[in-house]
């Protein structure tokens, strides 16, 4: 299978690494584009919008699949736009999609929006993100609220990590409150040029009566979570209490850089351990810190789990740890509370279903405090 058109490969080669990174320019391979159309099924749109069309890979596919549809592409880079026009066969508008406007509503909005964080000082819209805005989320939100027809479908290739970022909850909540999640199909391996970010095929439409998505589940607190394995997660958590229902504190730790100057030998008087990710995941040797370091100290008992990293698979593990004093690094999460509650948690965490639940829930490779609260308690 030819993954990219020649024009895209040549254009990609001409871009510097900085241009690709700053602009989030990573073209979608054919095998993933095919999955998008597979998930759309027999949907027949009258008009189609690709909001950040690049060199027009999706537009070329749409022209073959939807022969009678009107297709519009919007692209900020005139060089990409010229390639997307393909000898004037396609209607391509050179414009920043975020400031582009039209009264037309579209039956299908399709594409792979760029993914990059806005620079420091950018004034974010609190109805879109909490902070640290990302162009990908802005494009998604604008498509939903300004351009999607009432009976339309939005089909995009998006990073799986957007689903559990606390920064993007305003837009994710908009989706769970007003939209049907038709697909959130995770792509385990991909052939993107220049990036290995984990992605999903994400398809939504405006809420329809009686629709039940296999890509969402409702927590014990009533929150709806979107996940590629939503159906299985819902069955695991059904009827169970969760960590969030127990009287515990959930804490992150400190960065290694902030504590590095306080490292000492464990024989040093008053020193105490720093528990790192590897001490839980790989049972590595402990580091020790001088008693001159006083921030975020724990004393007594805690259940410690790896926070993980935003890539790869999340692998759950835990240690039931007790010491007079200790601190944890920021890739570790501490759960503290009364011994009787920690006994319940330790027993539950030893259950194989906890490992499965966390692996499926943490599809982006790491776990948040909010997700820790959703871990079911097994008796």
Swiss-Prot record:
The keyword Membrane is annotated on this UniProt entry: no
EC assignment: 2.1.1.72
A Pfam family per the record: N6_Mtase
Domain of life, source organism: Viruses
Coiled coil: none
PROSITE patterns: N6_MTASE
Keyword line: DNA-binding, Methyltransferase, Restriction system, S-adenosyl-L-methionine, Transferase
Enzyme class: transferase
Record's catalysed reaction(s): a 2'-deoxyadenosine in DNA + S-adenosyl-L-methionine = an N(6)-methyl-2'-deoxyadenosine in DNA + S-adenosyl-L-homocysteine + H(+)
InterPro entries attached to this UniProt entry: DNA_methylase_A-5 (IPR003356), DNA_methylase_N6_adenine_CS (IPR002052), N4_N6_ade-DNA_methylase (IPR050953), SAM-dependent_MTases_sf (IPR029063)
Biological-process GO terms, alphabetical: DNA restriction-modification system; methylation
GO terms, molecular function: DNA binding; N-methyltransferase activity; site-specific DNA-methyltransferase (adenine-specific) activity
Family: Belongs to the N(4)/N(6)-methyltransferase family.
PANTHER family (alphabetical): DNA METHYLTRANSFERASE A, DNA METHYLTRANSFERASE YEEA-RELATED
Protein's UniProt name: Type II methyltransferase M.CvrRI
Organism: Paramecium bursaria Chlorella virus XZ-6E (PBCV-XZ-6E)
Lineage start: Viruses, Varidnaviria, Bamfordvirae, Nucleocytoviricota, Megaviricetes
């Amino acid at each position: 299978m030819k993954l990219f058109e020649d024009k895209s490969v040549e254009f990609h080669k001409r871009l510097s690494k900085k241009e690709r990174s700053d602009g989030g320019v990573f073209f979608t391979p054919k095998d993933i584009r095919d999955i998008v159309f597979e998930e759309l099924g027999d949907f027949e749109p009258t008009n189609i919008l690709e909001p950040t069309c690049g060199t027009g890979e999706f537009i070329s596919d749409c022209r073959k699949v939807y022969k009678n549809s009107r297709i519009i592409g919007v692209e900020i880079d005139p060089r990409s736009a010229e390639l997307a026009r393909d000898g004037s066969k396609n209607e391509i508008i050179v414009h920043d999609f975020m400031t582009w406007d039209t009264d037309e509503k579209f039956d299908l909005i399709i594409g792979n929006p760029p993914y990059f964080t806005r620079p420091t000082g950018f004034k974010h819209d609190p109805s879109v993100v909490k902070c640290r805005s990302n162009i990908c989320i802005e494009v998604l939100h604008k498509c939903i609220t300004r351009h999607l027809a009432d009976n339309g479908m939005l089909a995009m290739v998006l990073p799986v990590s957007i689903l559990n970022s606390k920064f993007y909850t305003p837009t994710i909540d908009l989706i769970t409150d007003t939209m049907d999640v038709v697909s959130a199909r995770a792509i385990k391996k991909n052939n993107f040029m220049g990036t290995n970010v984990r992605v999903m095929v994400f398809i939504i439409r405006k809420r329809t009566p009686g629709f039940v998505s296999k890509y969402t589940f409702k927590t014990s607190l009533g929150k709806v979570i979107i996940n590629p394995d939503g159906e299985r997660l819902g069955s695991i958590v059904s009827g169970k209490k969760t960590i969030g229902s127990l009287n515990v504190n959930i804490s992150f730790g400190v960065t290694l850089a902030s504590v590095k100057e306080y490292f000492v030998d464990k024989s040093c008087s008053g020193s105490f351990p720093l528990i790192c990710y590897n001490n839980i995941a790989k049972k590595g040797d402990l580091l020790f810190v001088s008693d001159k370091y006083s921030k975020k100290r724990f004393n007594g008992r805690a259940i410690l789990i790896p926070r993980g990293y935003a890539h790869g698979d999340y692998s759950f593990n835990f240690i039931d740890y007790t010491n007079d004093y200790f601190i944890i690094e920021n890739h570790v999460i501490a759960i503290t509370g009364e011994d009787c509650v920690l006994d319940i948690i330790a027993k539950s965490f030893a259950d194989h279903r906890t490992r499965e639940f966390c692996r499926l829930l943490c599809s982006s490779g790491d776990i948040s405090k909010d997700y820790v609260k959703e871990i079911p308690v097994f008796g």
